[in-house]
Design a protein with these regions (language model features):
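Conserved G1/Walker A P-loop phosphate-binding module
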Residues: 1-72, 88-90, 94
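Conserved GTPase G-domain signal focused on the G5
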Residues: 21-22, 158-168
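Short acidic, glycine/serine/threonine-rich loops at helix termini
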Residues: 72, 136, 163-167
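Conserved C-terminal guanine-recognition region of P-loop GTPase G domains, centered on the G4
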Residues: 49-55, 78, 82-152
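Hydrophobic residues at beta-strand termini and immediately following loops
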Residues: 44, 152-154
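Short glycine-rich substrate-engagement loop in P-loop NTPases that contacts/grips substrate
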Residues: 69-81
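Conserved nucleotide-binding/hydrolysis micro-motifs of P-loop NTPases
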Residues: 32, 41, 65-67, 101-105, ...
Length: 168
């Protein structure tokens, strides 16, 4: 999804389930070295960095992992509430939903919530190499059509697909 080039600076939010590769993608996009861990709750506050592409500056906000954006009266952790409040506040011009391609069904619950919110959305299928190793075949075009937004496959840990994501 192209962001209109009316101004030189744009704000992008990375949102997704815990342990789906948000911070790894954030580091690949921005060149940062944020701490990455193989457990939920590593990112408990929003972190920001930037990158430039085609003469434009993009600020990227790495939100804590969350399974849901529900605003119902249920007990949520601090990291979930940070992500939920940020997305509900419509601060970002584009929400990039990082989805673990090897656990697609579980991750798409959050994606469907974002689609229903009608936020400007781009879905990143991360860890497509792991999905392929598990014998999973994902029809990226069909998924994009079904969701009504662009879908970009990447392997953030290796930087594969990051240039295509920046161009999207």
């Amino acid at each position: 999804m192209k962001i209109p080039a009316m101004k030189n600076e744009h704000l992008i939010a990375l949102v997704g389930n815990p342990n789906c590769g948000k911070t790894t993608l954030f580091n690949a996009l921005t060149g940062s070295r944020q701490r990455v861990g193989n457990w939920p709750g590593v990112t408990v506050e929003k972190k920001s960095g930037e990158y430039r592409h085609d003469g434009l500056r993009f600020e990227v906000v790495d939100l804590p992992g969350t399974y849901s954006l529900d605003v119902v009266d249920r007990e949520v952790s601090l990291d979930e509430s940070v992500a939920r409040d940020y997305v509900h506040g419509n601060e970002a011009e584009l929400v990039v939903n990082i989805v673990d391609a090897a656990n697609l069904e579980r991750n798409l619950y959050l994606t469907t919530q974002l689609v229903e919110m009608r936020v400007p959305l781009l879905v990143v299928l991360n860890m497509v190499d792991v999905a392929q190793a598990k014998g999973l075949a994902i029809d990226v075009e069909a998924l994009a059509h079904k969701l009504g937004c662009p879908v970009v496959p990447v392997v953030a840990s290796e930087g594969r697909g990051v240039d295509a994501l920046k161009a999207a």
